[in-house]
UniProtKB/Swiss-Prot annotation:
One GO MF term: toxin activity
Chief localization: secreted
Entry keywords, A to Z: Disulfide bond, Hydroxylation, Neurotoxin, Secreted, Toxin
Record carries keyword Disulfide bond: yes
Keyword Oxidoreductase: no
Domain text: The cysteine framework is III (CC-C-C-CC).
Top-level taxon of the source organism: Eukaryota
Cystine bridges: C4-C18, C5-C14, C10-C17
Protein name in the entry: Conotoxin mr3b
Source organism: Conus marmoreus (Marble cone)
Amino acid sequence: SKQCCHLAACRFGCTPCCW
């Protein structure tokens, strides 16, 4: 899975969410 750290991380299917 992608690893993202932005406000919409969960909505874009990224994991983990950093907030």
